[in-house]
Amino acid sequence: MKNSLIVKDNALINASYNLELTEQRLIMLAIINARESGHGITADSKLEIHASDYAKLFNVSADASYKALREAVNNLFNRQFSYTAEYKRTGKIGIVRSRWVSRIFYVDDLALLEITFAPDVVPLITRLEEHFTKYEAKQVAHLTSKYATRLYELLIAWREVGKVPQLELKEFRNRLGLVDNEYTAMSDFKKRVLEPSIKQINEHTDITVTYEQHKKGRIISGFSFKFKQKKQPQIEAKRDPNTPDFFVKMTDA
């Protein structure tokens, strides 16, 4: 499962929401489940998440994975997100607000969570042909900050160009899931949110990120980002010491 793909419509990537790290991870596992089912999902599909899968993918203890599933019963069901969409009759842009899931079923004895995505979520994670972002689950498996996970997604939506245009501060905060009274001082925002997130991304994912702050007068009004793909280490083929030199030379030729 570590090489499984997370695929989301860019509308969902750029949505505004506040999910705890465990909740983001459960959504990822459900998306992987939906993709690996091979036959698509609907708003009635029930997707199973096992504590063992959570523990294996995110390298956490059994207790931590059980806790993540138990807490989701109450917390994830109430979470919402919002995104912009076009009203087809007029072409006007409006705001869609939706829950993530319409149903949650938890079996404690089996350490099993069964979720059903809300109707608005289903088309944003399936049948995607354009305007979508994909990445390997293993890239975010070692991120321990909910902000780092969100920032990674926001960045790789721009993978082809390697940079993210300036994000106005309020919009950026909304996408990271910050409420109005959280880390209002810029020094706190950088210390608690931005810089730790970039540090984790640079250490644990496949990209290296830098940022630039933009000002209006003396006030920081937004941020832009540049990133590049890390070089993948080359795996050297190990020779069998029992292989005669004759065959080695033929192979190396």
Question: Residue locations for each model-derived region?
Answer:
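Charged, alpha-helix-forming regions
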Residues: M1-A253
